[in-house]
């Protein structure tokens, strides 16, 4: 497989044609913010936070789904991109009810971390104050759709890793939401295996364990890389991750 060379933020880097700009950037210590991306899941380019500028392209490109090309010159942190990212975080904040002080994921929330990172102190766009359905019918878990940012991590991990495909997206525009099966109560879902993978990969407090209180819902996603690596090698070995 041919090795391609390119430049990211003035730094010469290299990779293969099957790698994305996000892959290569992170391999070389260049941090590009994301919300929908998660190692082990297929990328969909939903959050648009990883948009980058590529010289010669008239539009911004999502780093998570853009494959390498020889001679690319990429910029990941220009003033234009900083404005775009701040605006995206503002819109995500305004479209939901994100009350950090009383959220189970306070201080463990990726959206909150990004808000700090982009310097978001106030939101310039009007809040929409949605009133979507909170579903606590499951024995162990709760989904608060007002905190959902539609990253689809839960949909993808349920489909690609667990193989259940309990979650999907229904509706359009501001009415778009995550639903279980044919828009039924989560607790009555015949396909849900109660594995909890969707809860662990959720970047906000939209999915959480019953009984969790303020700032207690610390998520972890390392298990996903472990499972994917073990399946790829067809070997269940606790040391697999250390070898990656």
Regions found by a protein language model. Name each.
Residues 13-70:
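N-terminal cofactor/phosphate-binding cores enriched in small/glycine residues
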Residues 48, 57-191, 200, 205-244:
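Fe-S ferredoxin-like electron-transfer domains
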Residues 9-11, 143-144:
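Extended, non-catalytic structural segments that build the interaction scaffolds
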């Amino acid at each position: 497989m041919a090795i391609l060379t390119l430049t990211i933020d003035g730094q010469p880097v290299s990779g293969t044609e099957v790698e994305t700009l996000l892959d290569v950037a992170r391999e070389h210590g260049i941090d590009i913010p994301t919300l929908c991306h998660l190692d082990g899941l297929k990328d969909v380019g939903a959050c648009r936070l990883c948009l980058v500028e590529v010289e010669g392209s008239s539009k911004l490109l999502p780093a998570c789904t853009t494959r390498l090309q020889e001679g690319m010159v990429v910029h990941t942190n220009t003033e234009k991109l900083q404005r775009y990212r701040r605006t995206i975080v503002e819109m995500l904040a305004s479209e939901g009810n994100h009350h950090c002080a009383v959220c189970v994921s306070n201080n463990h929330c990726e959206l909150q971390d990004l808000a700090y990172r982009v310097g978001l102190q106030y939101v310039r766009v009007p809040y929409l104050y949605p009133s979507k359905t909170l579903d606590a019918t499951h024995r162990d878990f709760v989904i608060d759709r007002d905190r959902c940012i539609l990253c689809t991590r839960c949909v993808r991990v349920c489909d690609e890793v667990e193989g259940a495909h309990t979650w999907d997206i229904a509706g359009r525009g501001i009415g778009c939401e995550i639903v279980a099966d044919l828009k039924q109560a989560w607790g009555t879902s015949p396909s849900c295996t109660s594995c909890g993978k969707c809860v662990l990969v959720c970047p906000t407090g939209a999915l959480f364990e019953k009984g969790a209180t303020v700032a207690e819902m610390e998520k972890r996603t390392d298990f996903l890389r472990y499972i994917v690596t073990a399946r790829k090698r067809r070997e269940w070995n606790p040391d697999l991750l250390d070898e990656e």
